[in-house]
Amino acid sequence: DESNLNVFNISNSNEPQFLKMVSVDYHVETIYPFENKLFIGSNNGMFIYDVESSPDSPVKAGEFTHARSCDPVIADQQYAYITLHSGTTCLGFNNELDIVKLNNLVDASLVKIYNLTSPQGLSKDGNLLFICDGADGLKIYNASDVSNLQLIKQFSGIETYDVIAFNNIALVVAKDGLYQYDYSDVNNIHIVSRIGLSNK
């Protein structure tokens, strides 16, 4: 919920069993699981919880504090990618991508900040980083060098909110519908389909 991590046993999906509530921070927004860690985004920062030794009782392993802002987060083996955006109830003023090195979870360090328009959801598949940048549309970067992201493709003309990239297909939630993009060829990333949303 807004300030706690609620742990459930879902081995029986018909009857989920509540196990524990772990206090995290005020205004928790997103949870991103990667390997044996949970990366939790809040208005004030990113919190890292270890679930390797005891999945039913997550233990705080580290955090990274940033300026107050709405905060989606994803991660890979080496870095966390955090988008901050303004113009919401989060009361922040930053519109940026923060890349944080995870070699020391207790003291995660900022690698670089990239200024954006109004970044929200993001996803990563291999070296491709997908960012929904609000009215600037979908931006796709080569992230092989996190200190020097290279923009490969931008799909403008749509207002994007969230993206899931998996197995060469990116599903993008936008203001006017659900878009599907094929990125099997990075030199020819293209739209596959769109399902429109009614404003009624």
Please identify what each model-predicted range represents:
Residues 164-200:
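Blade-level signature of beta-propeller repeat domains, shared across WD40, Kelch, NHL, RCC1
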Residues 2-4, 45-46, 86-91, 136-137, ...:
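Short glycine/acidic-enriched loop and turn motifs that connect beta-strands
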Residues 14-22, 56-64, 106-114, 147-155, ...:
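A short beta-strand motif characteristic of beta-propeller blades
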Residues 120-156:
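Intrinsically disordered, low-complexity segments enriched in Gly and acidic/Ser/Thr residues
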Residues 95-101:
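Beta-propeller blade signature
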Residues 37-40, 80-82, 128-131, 169-172:
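Conserved beta-propeller blade signature
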Residues 10-14, 51-55, 102-106, 143-147, ...:
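Short loop/turn segments that connect beta-strands within beta-propeller blades
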Residues 25-34, 66-77, 116-125, 158-167, ...:
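Repeated scaffold domains used in trafficking and secretory/extracellular systems
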